[in-house]
A protein has these predicted regions:
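Hydrophobic alpha-helical transmembrane segments in multi-pass integral membrane proteins
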Residues: 45-55, 104-119, 157-175, 224-239, ...
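Juxtamembrane helix-loop boundary signature in multi-pass membrane transporters
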Residues: 1-8, 101-157, 266, 270-287
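Membrane-embedded alpha-helical core segments of multi-pass
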Residues: 13-17, 44, 72-79, 99-107, ...
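Juxtamembrane helix-start motifs in multi-pass secondary transporters
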Residues: 33-34, 92, 177-178
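Structural signature of hydrophobic alpha-helical transmembrane segments
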Residues: 1-14, 56-73, 112-128, 175-187, ...
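Membrane-interface interhelical linkers
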Residues: 1-12, 20-21, 26-31, 36-66, ...
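Alpha-helical transmembrane segments of compact multi-pass small-molecule transporters, enriched
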Residues: 39-45, 95-109, 184-188, 228-231, ...
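Membrane-helix interface/capping residues of multi-pass secondary transporters
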Residues: 30, 89, 115, 174-175, ...
Length: 287
């Protein structure tokens, strides 16, 4: 039951990170927000080590999975933004989340994870809920292009592989793999931000006159994203990769709930149904 709680909490915290990232992206390009928040997340993880709340042992296995996870994290995010740029977001965003949950679930099956029939029903309901929660219907909804679908699937695969890497890291390594994933992600995306500035694709004046709010939202994005990584690692060390991963894929839930209560945005009927399915399926998995 604890792993179910941690998996569901992971989805809410990831969703909170996406919410703050979306707010920051109103003033800056998403790639800039992601690059800066990656380093904010690394600072947060470093503070966890210094405070003694977590420990990290950089064993060969932890380093290997951290490097692989960091590369796929950068890959998944780049594919995700490409998919959103092509659109439609209302289809490609939940598609990415669905694939991100399926990839670790398939890996879990290969690792020999088996469940009772009720748990399989609950897992299937969660995957349906993942798509419904992220899907926003409307009159202007169009079918995605093959290229958009490819980028959406690529984003989900990248995120899913990161979850597998975090699961495969030795428990004795503490949060070493999480730190390495964040470090490599920060180097790749932070390097891209520097490249944008050097080549003047983004003017340095972009950051002038921003005020504290965008910087605080980027800081929050990195902190919540790294916090979700920690919760996921704690979850898979307590229970099943499949269960924790499919619950983690519900991360759009946290985003839309904050949008509903903070920004007063209305929920579509499909999203309300998805939320109900998610809560019901989570209860089934817990009991």
């Amino acid at each position: 039951m604890l792993s179910v709680i941690l998996g569901f909490a992971t989805s809410l915290v990831y969703g909170t990170a996406d919410f703050f990232g979306a707010i920051a992206s109103r003033r800056l390009k998403p790639t800039l927000v992601t690059g800066i928040s990656a380093w904010a997340g690394l600072l947060f993880l470093s503070s966890m080590l210094v405070s003694g709340l977590f420990q990290a042992t950089f064993s060969p296995a932890a380093i290997l999975w951290g490097i692989i996870g960091g590369v796929f994290s950068a890959f998944g995010l780049s594919m995700f933004y490409r998919a959103l740029a092509i659109g439609p977001i209302s289809i490609l965003s939940p598609l990415s989340a669905l694939v991100a949950g399926l990839v670790p679930a398939i890996a879990g099956a290969f690792l020999g994870e088996r469940f009772g029939w009720l748990s399989y029903v609950a897992i299937a309901l969660v995957l349906v809920a993942v798509f419904l929660v992220g899907f926003v219907p409307g009159q202007d909804v169009r079918l995605p292009s093959p290229q958009g679908v490819l980028f959406g699937i690529g984003a989900g695969v990248g995120i899913g592989v990161v979850l597998i890497c975090l699961h495969n890291a030795p428990a004795s390594s503490g949060i070493a793999t999480v730190i390495l994933v964040r470090l490599i992600n920060g180097l790749v995306l932070g390097g891209y931000v520097i490249f944008q500035l050097v080549t003047r694709r983004v003017a340095a004046s972009t950051f002038k006159g921003l005020g504290p709010k965008p910087w605080l939202t980027m800081l929050a994005t990195g902190v919540f994203d790294s916090g979700a990584n920690l919760l996921f690692v704690l979850g898979v060390r307590q229970g099943s990769l499949t269960v924790v991963s499919v619950l983690t894929a519900l991360y759009p839930l946290g985003t839309i709930l904050l949008a509903r209560f903070v920004l007063k945005e209305k929920l579509a009927l499909s999203q309300s149904i998805g939320i109900a399915l998610a809560l019901g399926a989570t209860a089934l998995l817990a009991f």
